[in-house]
Amino acid sequence: MFENDILVAGADPGFGAIKLDIGDTKILFPAVICNGSERIFSTLGRTELERGSDIDRQVASLDVIVKNNSTGVERHYFMGSLAESLNPKEAHYCWDEDKSTDEEAMSLLIVGLALAQPYPKTNIYLGTGVPVKFYASLKDKYEAELKGSFSVTFLSGPFKGQTRSMNILRSRVLPQSYGVFIKETLTEDGNATNAKLFGGYVVVIDPGFRTTDIATFYDGIMLDPPNSFSIEKGLQWAYTGVAEKLKEMTANHASPIETDDKELDKIFRVNKGLYPWNNGAIDLNPVMKRMLSQLAADISREVMKTLKPMAGRIHTVLVAGKVGEMVFEYLNLENKVLIDDPQFGNAAGFRIMAANLVNNLTRKVNVD
């Protein structure tokens, strides 16, 4: 994790959730944000998880001030589940594909890093990724923008009153899905862990919140488009279908239910798919299963169509991501394998990539 006092971190700042991996610590929270405000009544009673680690309880109470130490600009935000609870009308996802210049998206990433860092002040070497379709246009921009000095002050939770500062020394960017391949094939020291995946055709499928990224490898090398590509469909598409069905199911009521992906994400994440309704609840799980099955069918069809020239020669299809785990059983693809800890597949791989780069730099300095 540490090389010469540098914290090596892997970040997967998706449209639906922030995932951070520093080796022995992983951070996960909904990528939901809104402007913060003074809290009066919301501080009364039980506002935090009673169980879990300090980090678990802090993740549930992200009332923070984020400061760019280079510009002096600071912002007060509610993030994650706290934003969903305290300001559901204003809480939102960050939809900009270019997160490097989106102040709110950057703040979500900075807070994730602050949660992960073990010391009040830390130097960070960051590995992260962008969707396959945007890699060529955004890689250099991300690496130029994702660095600098920042601080986070926690206004609630176990870390209340603490300020954590960081200096992001450098960021290295890979395509989404490449992180999964690295996780499955390399150690932090650059040693191979699965020789089979370095030979022949291997496909990585990483369904996400808005998009599904597909990366094709031959002898360990990621192939260019059209063999590596993005599908504009993910969990959000399934939520849209669930919302339409829910409205249809309550159409005869005086006030048919109109919901959105943000609320449904919380319903499935917190309420296990039970939508509170009329002194009871509507079980949305059967509808969700049908939508996930259709999503998997669409992904399978697109993969088979695009990769038809190599049909029969793909010996492993690695499936990653939380959404990948949800659709895995429905994917109609041969030789499919669900990786271990699928939600952190990219974040772990990006960390391993960054660790290898730091180790290489350290060895070069020692040799010189």
Predicted regions and their residues:
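Nucleotide/phosphate-binding catalytic cleft detector across ATP-hydrolyzing
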Residues: 1-202, 221-232, 270-368
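C-terminal amphipathic alpha-helical segment
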Residues: 238-296
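Conserved active-site beta-strand-loop modules that form the wall/rim of enzyme catalytic pockets
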Residues: 201-203, 210-215
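Long, well-ordered mid-to-C-terminal structural blocks that present hydrophobic/aromatic surfaces
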Residues: 207, 216-259
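Short beta-strand scaffold segments in enzyme catalytic cores
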Residues: 18-21, 212-216
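A short mid-domain helix/strand-loop element embedded in enzyme catalytic domains
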Residues: 177-179, 208-213
